[in-house]
Amino acid sequence: MRNFDYSKKWEKLLTPEIVALLTQIHEYKGEQSLFIEAKADTLTQLVEIAKIQSTEASNKIEGIYTSDARLKALVKDKTTPKTRNEREIAGYRDVLNTIHESHDYISIRPNMILQLHRNLYKFEGYDIGGKYKAADNIIEEEDEQGNKFVRFRPVPAWETPEAVENLCNEFDKALGTGTIDPLLLIPMFILDFLCIHPFNDGNGRMSRLLTLLMLYRAGYIVGKYISIEHLIEKTKESYYECLQESSLNWHEEENNYVPFVQYMLGVVVAAYRDFSDRVETLVASGLSKQERVAELIKNTYGEITKSQIMEKCPDISRITVERALSELLTSESIIKIGGGRYTKYVWNRDKE
């Protein structure tokens, strides 16, 4: 049985890169906690957008899709799921909402993890949710020729309940010492959870929900306003590379947590940076939405796409962004590069 004692393992994580990321996150947390309290009403739009992006991205990583219109309707609970994909999306939506609303009351214990997994599959007709895997599972990869091979063999089914119990106990024990930064413990826990792979299905989505929950419980609430799952989905190649690197020799307890921990901390830093940028955009005083689009392009040193503008200005509709771009092109304030889906824009500094 794998040993999950974190009391010494965390010390190996204190590389210059990881320490720098920890410092940035602590600084961001200190800067933005006061703003969150003072500007809670202003951030309502970010919360709703983050829910949609989180639900879409985490399911998309696992190949679970629906149309944009159906996704938004499902996340806002304005329709009922019609397909298996939509049932899984609706389940994710509900667990995500539970974490946002009740994170203080959801401890990191096996019974709570099973409850969240049961809710993840509550719209399914078959009885899969809330149960550990009944048979051993493997993690496969496919090469460029389409040949499949085993990348990792998780903990056997018969060991899984005890492994999850031990994992939660050791995490709780390490957290209770007060000497280990939770930002180090959380990705270590998540890596071990993924190596156990406790369920027949839903392990990846559960790992991302647990990441959000644990960040919340540690006082890092950026995931309420910026989708952690969306940032992972955008960098999923790096995610899988770091996961694979950190899981090598896991069963022998000789694995290196550093790649995965560094990746996850980088995601949290990116979330805080994104949050800071969006907050500045939302509270820009005295500017119309079209003027905000212009300011964003002007302050971007290089090219920017329409989708990037919409991501930076989530409260501005596509039509308004397109109208602003059209007006800026007409006035020659910006330059259009390329065409179609590859169109980019850059500020015309010769006009200044």
Description of each model-found segment:
Residues 1-352:
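FIC/Doc superfamily catalytic core
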